[in-house]
């Protein structure tokens, strides 16, 4: 810091500090004089040739504006220097006010939001339930059956449509004899049991044969998204064109090769599936206990969050949702109107995330935690196992500094969880593979 800069601080609250900064007026005067001389070289004033305008005229016409520009520049150049000199952990941009020239000094006040220095409560009172699961043969068989279903085909079937069959049909809906928008379609495909349609629709089609026609009566749910249809009784004329049954692919060499199994047959596929499921269990269990631990801490630690942090988190979550929209609907994220996603939609979750970030940072600072590079290497190696060329993935995360920094951040957060768990009480609970993964998916959707 420049030795001629004077700074005093006044902590207004746990999240805000005010600095009073004094800059010697000579700094201002020297810069003002320099700029006035520069302006004089090109200034045009009636009655004088370019470059020959008297300095008194230049000062009279341009002096006040130049001085204000210089003051703004000096404030911009010194405010962050002042913040740094006081070891202030600022959040967002400072707010400048009360600017004045006083006793040979330029004096101004800078109010800045600061990273809260909280005393974390309840660390030794944490009680969480840690879910665990074991992969059994039935789980593996179910997973392989799901892999087959992902590649199932439908072949024509003679006879009545039953659960699991795919029916191709035309339908025409009406309410009180009047057709309604969206109530008709041709060559519509429906798998019986998929619950894709409103209640009663599938039941009306079940048992029909190709070439059969009939009218079914259904009632739209009271909470149906189209308000003009909600709770209304409707009639649908159904014309079944085709009934098909599911045909799963054989567990032959061609099917096995789809999953990278060239040797070892079905047993090798089962082994690969089991290992992948065990990785999923490890990740899901880790995610569950992390969430439970953080939830327990957040219940005991409510504190104000700097507005800048909250605004940044709201914007981050809004951008994430827009990205999900773009992936789901195939549109560019920039094409979505942000006004459709107001701040209020994200405030609760953003406040939680901001508080959690502060808590994690405080644990790291107060306990002197440093990222475990061995865990980083293990993390990268395990992540790479999910890709066709693990060596290439490892090289990418090892050489790309930003990507490695992201992984280090995740690992350090895991170390925080380990520390917190070590201070509290953890009870293990065995759950099924399906329940553990379903809980993880639900947790991710809520974020």
Swiss-Prot record:
Consists of 3 domains; the N-terminus binds the ribosome, the middle domain has PPIase activity, while the C-terminus has intrinsic chaperone activity on its own. GO terms for biological process: 'de novo' cotranslational protein folding; cell division; chaperone-mediated protein folding; protein transport; protein unfolding. Residues 164-249 form the PPIase FKBP-type domain. Its EC number is 5.2.1.8. GO terms for cellular component: cytoplasm. InterPro entries: PPIase_dom_sf (IPR046357), PPIase_FKBP_dom (IPR001179), Trig_fac (IPR005215), Trigger_fac_C (IPR008880), Trigger_fac_C_sf (IPR037041), Trigger_fac_ribosome-bd_bac (IPR008881), Trigger_fac_ribosome-bd_sf (IPR036611), Trigger_fact/SurA_dom_sf (IPR027304). Keywords: Cell cycle, Cell division, Chaperone, Cytoplasm, Isomerase, Rotamase. NCBIfam families: tig (TIGR00115). It catalyses: [protein]-peptidylproline (omega=180) = [protein]-peptidylproline (omega=0). Belongs to the FKBP-type PPIase family. Tig subfamily. Involved in protein export. Acts as a chaperone by maintaining the newly synthesized protein in an open conformation. Functions as a peptidyl-prolyl cis-trans isomerase. It is an enzyme of class 5 (isomerase). This is Trigger factor. It comes from the Bacteria. PANTHER family: TRIGGER FACTOR CHAPERONE AND PEPTIDYL-PROLYL CIS/TRANS ISOMERASE, TRIGGER FACTOR-LIKE PROTEIN TIG, CHLOROPLASTIC. Pfam families: FKBP_C (PF00254), Trigger_C (PF05698), Trigger_N (PF05697).
């Amino acid at each position: 810091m420049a030795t001629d800069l004077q700074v005093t601080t006044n902590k207004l609250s746990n999240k805000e500090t005010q600095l009073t900064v004094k800059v010697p007026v000579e700094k201002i005067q020297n810069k003002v004089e320099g700029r006035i001389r520069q302006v004089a070289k090109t200034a045009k004033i009636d009655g004088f040739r370019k470059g020959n305008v008297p300095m008194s005229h230049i000062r009279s016409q341009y002096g006040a504006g130049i001085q204000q520009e210089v003051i703004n520049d000096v404030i911009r150049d010194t405010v962050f220097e002042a913040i740094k000199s006081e070891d202030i952990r600022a959040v967002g941009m400072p707010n400048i006010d009360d600017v004045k020239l006083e006793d040979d000094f330029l004096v101004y006040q800078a109010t800045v939001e600061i990273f809260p220095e909280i005393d974390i409560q309840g660390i030794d009172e944490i009680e969480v339930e840690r879910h665990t699961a074991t992969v059994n043969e039935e789980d593996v068989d179910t997973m392989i059956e799901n892999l087959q279903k992902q590649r199932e085909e439908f072949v024509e079937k003679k006879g009545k449509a039953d659960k699991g069959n795919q029916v191709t049909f035309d339908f025409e809906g009406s309410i009180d004899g009047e057709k309604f928008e969206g109530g008709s379609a041709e060559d519509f495909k429906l798998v019986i049991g998929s619950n894709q349609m409103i209640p009663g629709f599938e039941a009306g089609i079940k048992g029909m044969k190709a070439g059969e026609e009939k009218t079914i009566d259904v009632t739209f749910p009271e909470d149906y998204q189209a308000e003009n249809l909600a709770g209304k009784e409707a009639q649908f004329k159904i014309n079944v064109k085709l009934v098909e049954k599911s045909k799963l692919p054989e567990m032959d060499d061609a099917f096995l090769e789809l999953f990278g199994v060239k040797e070892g047959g079905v047993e090798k596929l089962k082994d690969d599936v089991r290992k992948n499921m065990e990785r999923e269990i490890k990740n899901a269990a880790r995610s569950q206990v992390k969430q439970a631990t953080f939830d327990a801490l957040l219940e005991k630690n409510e504190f104000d969050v700097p507005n800048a942090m909250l605004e940044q988190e709201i914007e981050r979550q809004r951008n994430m949702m827009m990205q999900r929209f773009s992936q789901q609907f195939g549109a560019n994220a920039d094409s979505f109107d942000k006004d459709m996603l107001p701040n209020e939609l994200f405030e609760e979750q953003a406040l939680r995330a901001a508080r959690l970030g502060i808590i994690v940072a405080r644990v790291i600072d107060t306990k002197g935690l440093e990222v475990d590079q061995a865990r980083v290497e293990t993390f990268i190696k395990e992540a790479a196992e999910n890709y066709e060329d693990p060596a290439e993935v490892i090289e990418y995360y090892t050489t790309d500094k930003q990507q490695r920094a992201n992984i280090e951040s995740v690992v350090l957060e895991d170390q925080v969880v380990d520390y917190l768990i070590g201070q509290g009480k953890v009870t293990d609970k065995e759950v099924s593979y399906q329940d553990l993964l379903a809980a993880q998916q639900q947790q991710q959707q809520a974020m």
